[in-house]
Amino acid sequence: MATPSATRTIRNPKTRFNWRVSDIVRRSKSNWLSLKAKVTGRGYRCVALEGESEYNITVNSDLTVSCNCQDYDGSGHIGDLKKNTFEEVFFGPVATKLREDLAKGKIPIPVCSRCGDLRRMSRAESKQPLPKGRLPYRGMLLENTVRCNVDCIGCAREGAANVRTSKQMSLEELSKMADLAKHLGLQQIFYLNLGEPFLSPNIGQELPLLRSKLPDCRIVISTNGIVLNTDAKREAALSSSQILFSVHGINNEMCEKYMIRSSFDKAYAAMRDMVAYRNARGLKSPVLEWKYLLFNWNDKPATLRKAIEMAQEIGVDMISFWPTHNPFYGMSWRYRLGLLNRFGEKNWKGREWDFRTRGRI
């Protein structure tokens, strides 16, 4: 069975100020939530560890399993699929202790404090025996590689890469993960985590393999778009259900402020060419979405209007605007104050303009 292990030290960690602030906020919130549970007698539960989340549970590139999608230091590792079955990992001692600690009102790892799958129990629930939960079925993350060609200010990817024993999942391993997804009856696979999926040298085989074994599964990819630049990769991408292009601005300068080493010109061309490649084959899938993180340097109304016009011009299916708080100094106050409410419809992402239903701007 999988056994708890101490978090491995990250070699040469980056020390960006916003990461340090984020760590302080997480620790402070963890302490507050633990105190709140002690005073009220109400513990917590984790939707992901109950098997009811469509996100968060992640199979990493080295086949370790994490309970969350921001496991930069390995503190969320619940087991290793090279040593144990998924059932042994998911119901094993590490995951069980996380569930038990939460039920007692303890926040076992700081990332729990800001996780969307954390739920507060009622007093009645807190007095009941801890339910075992079930195996995930709604969705999981699958990380084919932890390598990336850009360096986002809000992402501690290099720390995670130093924790991984393998930075690239082999094709044989991926095939086994597809079999696992079929065994679990997963409704969705999010083919993403802390790396750039299209950097994998095997991407041309990976996506068709997943689709062949999981014909009815929704497969979602997130990419910065820069290396989705050949017909071979575009052909592989047709095996997915949806592709989110993370492009956070309308020019190189704007994008590179958050996503270092990025290129708006290349990413925009990648979106345009993927639309053309799909449409030339008479297809409507995958759904192609421009994912636009909102910061205080890219959120002026005129800028968003221009982004919508540019998205419309190349024919993507939608553009979505996502508020974020990392880095904290880049937070979009225009969004928080409701000054961007005329741009698309409100949903769980933030704001979204869907050209298929809303039409042209």
Predicted regions and their residues:
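Immediate flanking context of iron-sulfur cluster ligation sites
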Residues: V94-P110
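Radical SAM enzyme [4Fe-4S]-AdoMet core and its adjacent flexible, acidic
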Residues: M1-N84, E88, K104, R164, ...
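Membrane-interacting alpha-helical segments
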Residues: K106-S126, Y292
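Short metal-coordination and nucleic-acid-contact micro-motifs, chiefly zinc-binding Cys/His arrays
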Residues: R42, P108-V111, N144, C148
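Active-site/binding-pocket entry motifs
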Residues: T64, T96, L118-M121, G249
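Conserved alpha-helical substructure of the radical SAM core
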Residues: C46-V47, S75-I78, D101, D117-Q242, ...
